[in-house]
Curated annotation (Swiss-Prot):
Keyword Transcription among record annotations: no
Gene: ruvA
Endpoints of the signal sequence: none
GO MF, one annotated term: ATP binding
Organism (species): Streptococcus pneumoniae serotype 19F (strain G54)
Protein name: Holliday junction branch migration complex subunit RuvA
Record region (Domain I): 1-63
Principal localisation: cytoplasm
Span list, region Domain III: 148-197
Subunit structure and binding partners: Homotetramer. Forms an RuvA(8)-RuvB(12)-Holliday junction (HJ) complex. HJ DNA is sandwiched between 2 RuvA tetramers; dsDNA enters through RuvA and exits via RuvB. An RuvB hexamer assembles on each DNA strand where it exits the tetramer. Each RuvB hexamer is contacted by two RuvA subunits (via domain III) on 2 adjacent RuvB subunits; this complex drives branch migration. In the full resolvosome a probable DNA-RuvA(4)-RuvB(12)-RuvC(2) complex forms which resolves the HJ.
Entry-linked Pfam families: HHH_5, RuvA_C, RuvA_N
Function noted in UniProt: The RuvA-RuvB-RuvC complex processes Holliday junction (HJ) DNA during genetic recombination and DNA repair, while the RuvA-RuvB complex plays an important role in the rescue of blocked DNA replication forks via replication fork reversal (RFR). RuvA specifically binds to HJ cruciform DNA, conferring on it an open structure. The RuvB hexamer acts as an ATP-dependent pump, pulling dsDNA into and through the RuvAB complex. HJ branch migration allows RuvC to scan DNA until it finds its consensus sequence, where it cleaves and resolves the cruciform DNA.
């Protein structure tokens, strides 16, 4: 079991980042890979959780210990696997998540990909009173400006598909952002907030 890895981020894709430490490149599946865009070729410390399956050994990465604890709480719920837990964390509304669990807001919880009514009810049953989230330390939404071609938006939509959101949902979101320019990270944050509301 690993607590964290410290190394240099060498690659970012829609589903994972690669962290090189001591000459070994580790694939870390993270909630929002593009959140690490500003740290490529820089040293970073990423908290990790290893999942061992019959066909794979996977590492999941987190920006903080609190995010890792939230992930571990989520995967402890029957019906929520690591991919679904990352999608929930990627929504970047941890306070809203805790409030939905505490107030038994099933409608809010079912807006996450692959979370149906029964799983949402199980989340409330298993996590009510047990999930505490420290303050939301991520930056506020950045104003977007017009642009003709938008590679960042394409990368954001690809990452959203990787999180399990449907292409039909993402088409509507993409139209909303067309003609704007921003980072893939901010597009993802904004899109997730729109989808969760």
């Amino acid at each position: 079991m690993y607590a964290y890895l410290k190394g240099i981020i060498t690659k970012i894709t829609a589903k994972y980042i690669v962290l090189e430490t001591n000459g070994i490149g580790y694939i870390l599946h993270v909630a929002n890979p593009y959140a690490y865009s500003g740290q490529v070729n820089q040293e970073d410390q990423i908290y990790v959780h290893q999942v061992v399956r019959e066909d794979a050994h996977l590492l999941y990465g987190f920006r903080s210990e609190d995010e890792k604890k939230l992930f571990l709480s989520l995967i402890s719920v029957s019906g929520i696997g690591p991919v679904s837990a990352l999608a929930i964390i990627a929504a970047d509304d941890n306070a809203g998540l805790v409030q939905a669990i505490e107030t038994k807001n099933i409608t809010y919880l079912t807006k996450f990909p692959k979370i149906g009514k029964k799983t949402a009810q199980q989340m409330v049953l298993d996590l009510e009173g047990k999930v505490v989230v420290a303050g939301d330390d991520l930056p506020a939404k950045v104003a977007v400006q017009a642009s003709a071609e938008n590679q960042e938006l394409e990368e954001a939509m690809e990452a959203m598909l990787a999180l399990g959101y449907k292409a039909t949902e993402l088409k509507k979101i993409k139209k909303f952002f067309e003609g704007t320019t921003d980072t893939a990270e901010n597009y993802i944050k904004s899109a997730l907030k729109m989808l969760v509301k």
